[in-house]
Every structure is written in C-alpha cells, then in structure tokens.
Amino acid sequence: MLNKNSASSQSLPRVHSFFNMIPSIMQDDLALTILNDRDNMFSIKSQRSHGEDLIVTPFAQILASLRSVRNNLLSLTNVPASNKSRRPNQSSSASRSGNPPGAPLSQGEEAYTRLATDTIEELDWCLDQLETIQTHRSVSDMASLKFKRMLNKELSHFSESSRSGNQISEYICSTFLDKQQEFDLPSLRVEDNPELVAANAAAGQQSAGQYARSRSPRGPPMSQISGVKRPLSHTNSFTGERLPTFGVETPRENELGTLLGELDTWGIQIFSIGEFSVNRPLTCVAYTIFQSRELLTSLMIPPKTFLNFMSTLEDHYVKDNPFHNSLHAADVTQSTNVLLNTPALEGVFTPLEVGGALFAACIHDVDHPGLTNQFLVNSSSELALMYNDESVLENHHLAVAFKLLQNQGCDIFCNMQKKQRQTLRKMVIDIVLSTDMSKHMSLLADLKTMVETKKVAGSGVLLLDNYTDRIQVLENLVHCADLSNPTKPLPLYKRWVALLMEEFFLQGDKERESGMDISPMCDRHNATIEKSQVGFIDYIVHPLWETWADLVHPDAQDILDTLEENRDYYQSMIPPSPPPSGVDENPQEDRIRFQVTLEESDQENLAELEEGDESGGESTTTGTTGTTAASALSGAGGGGGGGGGMAPRTGGCQNQPQHGGM
C-alpha cells in the first residue's frame, strides 16, 4: 500500500479480529442493506491490493458508495466518463444489475429501474451520513466511535459468561478506550458510606482517597522533574579514544556480537542479549542499530555523546520492574528497527524520521514506576497532578528523556539545525504519547481509515506527502512494536507474559495493602492468564496487526501467522470451567454487573452514526455473569499480558460487585 502496487493474492486471515464479528456484505449489495445496519462491512475486490478486502471505516464506506453512485449514473445516463479527475473504475464498483461499471442501460428495462432505485437509496444514505458529520470532528473520529461501539458490544456479551470474563472485559475497556467514562454504580463505594468508613477505621483500614491523602510521600517540587538522578551517572564514562565495539564493556563480547548480528530479525533472543551485555541491553541494541543505519553520521551524532546519553538513559529505567525496564525498551527498539526495514517502507522515511522513531522507542518507558496510569491517578500522585491525569506516564517519560539531553555530554542532537531539532522533538513527543494504550482505538481507527480510503479510491498507493500522514504511520509502527510480544516465538511470548503479570500482581499487592480497589488483572489470587491472552489477541492485537499487514502487504504475513499460532496455544491452555457446586443459597451473591457507558459527547456522536440501527442509538450495554456468552468468539476475552508495555491507563468501565469486593 506504500509507494507500490502489490500483486493480487489471497486475503489476509481475519480469523480472530473483532472486525469479523459482524456480517460482511458486498459493496454492490450496499444500497439495499446498509440502511438497516450501520455496523455492516463492505467487501470489495481490488486488482491493485490483495484479493477481497473488507471496508469497515465510515469515511471509506461513504467514498465507496459515492463511487458506486457515479458508476451507476454512467450506466443510467449513457454519459461518457471523464478521465480528467477520476481514477479507473474498480471491479468492486460494479452495479447491482451485474453490468460492468458504466455499461449502458435502456429506460424501461427491469435492470434500469432496479439500478435507479438502488442508486437513489445509496445516495440518500451518503447524504444522511454527511449531514450528521460534525465539523469539529475528523473522519477518523467516526471510525473510532464505531470501533468503540463494536468493542463495547462484544465485551458486554463476554462479561456475561463468568466472573473472569467480567474482569477481563473491564481490563480491556479501562485500558484501551481513551474517554473518561461515567459509571452507574449499583451501590455506594466504601468511602462514600459513613458506616463502612467507620467500620474500616475501627479495623485500622483506609479508603483509597484517605490513603492517598495521609500516606502518599511528598515528591520533589513540581518545578522539578521527578525521577532524574543527581548527580547523573555516566556523564564522563567514555573518556578514552577507543569505544566498546557494541557500546558496553562485557567479557562476553563475541557471544553478544553474534546475537546483535541478528538485529534485523523478528524475534531475536533479547533475553540473552540482556545477559551478555551485563544488563545493558538498551545501550548495545540502540548503539548497534544507529551504527548499522549510519544514523550517527547522517544526524551528526558524536558516538561518545551517544553512548553517554544511552548509558544515562538506561540508568533511569527501573531495574526492579519485572516488565517495564530497559530490556523491554531494547525489545521495542529492536522491533521498531525491523518494522522500519519492511520492503513496503523502503525509501519512504528520511534519516531524521527513522532516527526520531528509534529514539522514541528507546525512551518510551524511561523511569516507569511499574504502576499504571490509573493507579497514579487514583492515589493522587504528584505525576498525576502535574499532568492533569492525562497520559501521566507518557508525559513523564518524555520530560525525563529530554531533561537528560540537557546533561553535559549527553546532547546527541547538538549538531542539528534548530528547525531539524524542533521537528524531531515534535515527532518524538507525538510517538511517545501514542504509546498510551488508552489511545489504541484512535490509532487503529486512523490507520484503518487511511488504508481503506486508498483501497476504495483505487490507487493502492499511500503517498504520505504531509506530516500528519507520515507521523500517523510512525505512531502505529511504534505502537505495533510495543504490542509485539504476542507475535514473537512462543517461548519469548510466554516469558514476557509471566513478567508482565508479575508486575501487575505487585501493583495489586500494593493496592491490597493500601485498602484500594484492586485493578483488573492485578489480583494474583484471581488471575485468568490464558483466557486473558486469547481475548487480548482477539480484541486488540490481531485487529492492529491485521491493519498494519494491509498497509505493508505482504511483508507482515509471517508475523500474523505466528500471532495466530500463539493464540491457538493459549486457547488450548485455558483450564475447563469448574463444575457447578451444590445449591447456591444466594445466587445473586456472586453476580457482577458490567456496564459500559460512553461520555455524553460520544453518546451524541454514536447516536448520529447509528440512526436507523436496531439498537436505537443506545450507548449503554449491560449484562451479568452466570448467563451464556453471546460473543462470536469462543473463549475470547481481553487484556492480560505479553503486549509490551500494555498497562491499564486512564478511563474505562468498571465492575462493581453488588456485595463486597471483587
């Protein structure tokens, strides 16, 4: 899809994507069907892409309909087609009559009347959609709202299946939706009930709000950036003429060199690199990549300065974190490097853009505390106050990284012109902020809209001739790298899952000790790891990688194949549900209400997009455990682990136990 026309081939597998959870229709059936179902997908055949393609984003659907209307008018009016501004017609735009695009019809024929009626209905649908578009919202917002509705519907069904399904649904909702949600609470929270507060006080317990006010340690003044160590280490570490071959001093240089020779390979043995580099994986991986790409030369970065900065940066990753440490940063950086090498992207990005993407991957989790954004917000942390609860960790990572550049001997961009430096800084900020997992749906919607619009337009080529389009691809590229663990060889994937779950459990332990509500997937006594991985792949990872694979087709097919094999493994490892135990004296005791309620602004926009849908524009779905799951995917849930850096962020829906805690 980028700067080249790919040959026709088989469609990419869409086995587990939530895009497939609704029926698909051929574009030439649109006029009769789409008026009754706003969630339907278009299926078009493109000679310029790869077989049959599903169109799900609203803007691309409108564009496809208008192209169909145009072709129908050519058939109805016998007006010669003008080639001044239109690309050649695609076979996907054939009319319902079965005639090729532009084939003349005679008045009075049944096919003529049917085609005229279909054309009017299709044009009316397009007008309805265009009339409801708000001028202050982008076309990508239309897709994002639609995807949220699809995801909410599926999570509601899944939450009905079991307590674990409810917990997993809550995790996905709270992690991957970027809007703060309003909650319909079935009962008072502990800290809102005076009697419960008094009882807990007598027992020596505290609510989350009380704990935050009385126990939160005072951080540094907000005029300073917390987490920056003083004095900074490694300022003058490399004073000699000879620099280490791979950027780090290690007695196992030969073994390390062998592994680093595979940096362009997907699924490198990153854990061995961490061992052979004496726990300096980020420094050696970044140094080797920048050397091999000749970025030190093209960006005029002194090698000694680069190593000073990278060593200082790596020191500011928290080594005690099981997951969010410098090894994870090295893994994301190496994955970003491989994705930048994909043939479809050859020659697309400048050295400044490539260097910016790799730099963003290096710094994207620096000084991560091993806690989620939502934990920092709930505990009224200094960081949450500083960044107004918005992308708290991501803003902090950026602030720390750019502050480290100001340290003497660490400014790797010192030789850049002011304009270049400003451009790179803007790129890095945009990319790192996009690693906030609550932005996932917006990123996916943007990418899907871009890909499908080009498919419908018939070009099959993305020019990427402006900053918005170029940074959008780079943001999604690094986002894919950050969510790449489920696409790696199974032994690596399983190891990452174990590390991430341990970090989640450590947060859950803190929450339990502090009297706070335990976050979804953070209770080590109530974990559903295998099931969560299946759902995480089905609802989050596969849709993202599927769309990326469409963009760079066919370069990511092997990655998709591995992803599906890993999904099947975890599906096979889900333990059977325990048999029902005796008679439940109080069947309501264990029932948990799951509810997804969108913001008022999102409700209004969804209502506009869904007018005429059988749901009547409602944006709230409710279910309870103990009923049969209506999900189209067997065993699908969500969230869990193994998706590099995926941690619950701001916003989302909550499970509210009707009787006590989770």
Swiss-Prot record:
Source species of the chain: Drosophila melanogaster (Fruit fly)
Biased segments, Polar residues type: 80-98, 652-662
Biased composition annotated in UniProt, kind: Acidic residues: 599-616
Family matches, as SUPFAM superfamilies: HD-domain/PDEase-like (SSF109604)
EC number in record: 3.1.4.53
Ranges of biased composition (kind: Low complexity): 617-634
Cofactor requirements of the protein: a divalent metal cation
Binding site for a divalent metal cation 1: 328, 364-365, 482
Region named Disordered: 79-108, 207-245, 599-662
Keywords: cAMP, Hydrolase, Metal-binding
Signal peptide coordinates: none
Extent of Gly residues compositional bias: 635-646
Annotated PDEase domain residues: 248-577
Any Pfam family: PDEase_I
Record-annotated site: Binds AMP, but not cAMP: 485
Full protein name: 3',5'-cyclic-AMP phosphodiesterase, isoform F
Active site: 324
Residues binding 3',5'-cyclic AMP, per UniProt: 324-328, 365, 482, 533
GO MF, one annotated term: 3',5'-cyclic-AMP phosphodiesterase activity
Cited PANTHER family: CYCLIC NUCLEOTIDE PHOSPHODIESTERASE
CC annotations in GO: synapse
Assembly notes: Monomer.
Claim: Metal-binding is one of the keywords in the record: yes
